[in-house]
Amino acid sequence: MNITEFEQRILDQKPVESGHYDSEYFTGDWRAEGNNYNLETRRQIEAKNPFLIRDVFQPKKVLDLGCGPGALMHLLWELGVNVEGIDFAESSRQLATPQVRDRITVGYVGDLGIKPANAYDLVICREVLEHLTVLQVKQTVANMVRMTSKFIYVTTRFHPNPSNLLDFTTQFDVDPTHITLLNKDMLRLMFVLEGCRSRPDLEARMDWGNKGRVLVLEKIASQP
């Protein structure tokens, strides 16, 4: 993909409307292998992830950006982690457990006014960026760096075989809202240009499933 093709693809992208993410999206039978957002289902899928988040990052205050119905938030809450969430869909609050419902703010993940700067020592953004346009990904990366004081932990779907740095694709066979699968190096570059450094040591600890979908970044202290 050359720069002209990249530009046109970006201009052609259309954001997914928040109303698409209703209860059917999160809990419907369309999800492969029962991969829905019921709490006990997520508990099995998450396995040791909540414990790793607590132990690897040792956070005092966590933001789950694009938290969905808050299943990971609930599992972290059970471990005594102080966690808040942001999600685009009103259904996320409705489907969340009572323990975390009031900790979820409904809003756009790229909104620079939604939370204060440096308010969290860990910002989590998992399985979110593939649902955004490339321009929205750029905005969301900047917002994550703004809101964290230390670490960012990201998982997303990446282009399985990019031709170059600019190349991105879709994954409609898995989810019709998977509109952006970036080159992994492109996403890392976005964070580096916002003033972060990669933490491959922490990525290795968090990617215990060896899926190759984890990024961990540390904000450089001099960044505002």
Predicted regions and their residues:
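Helix-to-beta-strand junctions that scaffold the AdoMet/dcAdoMet cofactor pocket
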Residues: 132-133, 148-149
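Conserved beta-strand signature within the Rossmann-like core of class I S-adenosyl-L-methionine
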Residues: 149-158
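Feature marks short, surface-exposed loop/turn motifs that line or immediately flank catalytic pockets
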Residues: 160-162
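Conserved N-terminal segment of class I S-adenosyl-L-methionine
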Residues: 1-118, 122-124, 135-142, 158, ...
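Conserved helix-to-beta-strand junction in the class I
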Residues: 143-147
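Short catalytic micro-motifs in class I SAM-dependent methyltransferases
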Residues: 126-131
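Short glycine/proline- and charge-enriched loop/turn segments
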Residues: 166-175
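Short, well-ordered secondary-structure micro-motifs
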Residues: 96, 164-165
